[in-house]
Amino acid sequence: MLFQAGHCQSRDEHLWPKQQFTHIREALAHLPDDVILDGELYVHGWSLQKINSFCSVHPNCTPKPNAHELIYNIFDCFFPLHPLRSFAERTHWIQSTLAHLPAPISVVPTHRVTAPLEAEELYTHYRQLSYEGTMYRDSESPYGTQLSCGNKENRWTCLLKRKDWQDAEFEIVDYELTTGKHNEQGFKLTCKTESGRTFSVGSGLSHVEMRDYVLAPPIGRLARVRYLALSDQGVPTQLTLEAIL
């Protein structure tokens, strides 16, 4: 979530209505208008699905009970009038300005590392605390604006996310070819969990494999799927097809 001058905006550029996250807006009301905070809404132990259920952008939505439990975890900031400030400078500003604030504001811990072993130890430490992973940044780099992130995934070359992935096998119950909005060919493979819930995966096959499976659909076979976590219903999220067995 981006925050500036009392406004909260999602990464897909939707503004949250003013009745959402009032506890966060009030906690940050003293900040100058020329800084944009970058972070995420989080409650340790809650699933992403549960957190998202509190984050409606509908103009007339009613905040859910317990919405005040959402914590704004801040990990970066941007100064439009000073766009070249380094990550080290921005981190210093965050620490000196925000670190003393109580909930619902939380400054994400940032550590300077000088050797791979230090990074490995910190990654292990935070995984043991049940966090998904860590983010590595170049301390001298400016904030990665959209103009700086020129590749199709909109990735900033000075930031690297590290997470653990899991894999499991699921029965395939349907397969079909798809066409994207730019007429590119794709596929949708529908799988079933042991509890009977279905989900779809649409990445991980070459174009040759896509066409081959039209002639000989893999229904009834097993798909090995790589995923980050399970939803509250036990369905894999952020998934990629590794293989059809």
Question: For the regions a protein language model found, what residue spans apply to each?
Answer:
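Covalent nucleotidyltransferase
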Residues: M1-A103
